[in-house]
Amino acid sequence: MSREWIPDFANFRRDGYDFDARWDDGLASYKDKELYETIADEGRMLSKRLKEALNYRKGGNTGFETCITRLQMQSYVCIADFVYMQDKYGRPYGWGVAEYATPEDLFGYDFITSAYQRDPQESKERILKHLQSRLPNATEMQLEKIIKG
């Protein structure tokens, strides 16, 4: 997804809700709220640290992957970077650890919410029209599957 389409994508995937409104309408779970607010308050946070802070470990909270995936699918949270641990010589090793952030933190609140004046369905139609021009052989069902996830 190119930068210019992120506001419409967020508007469509969020169904026109900012996170607080989604919570107020009873459409978000307590665990989602806790994860979202922790990331939003910190700015950026490694998954390892996030799991520790919210007690997602053996004998603690469960469902971290489910909640974080849902928040990503709704475009309230995204992976900002992958950070590699370092050995005693300062060399990176192993798998990268996801660093989560909100799109608002990465791109700015005004930019992310710039499509909020549109109906989410209008944002969807704009994205579909763009994808049809880029992927002329794709069916509408295939394109919808791409943007819905």
Where are these regions (language model features)?
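Long, low-complexity intrinsically disordered regions
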Residues: 1-149
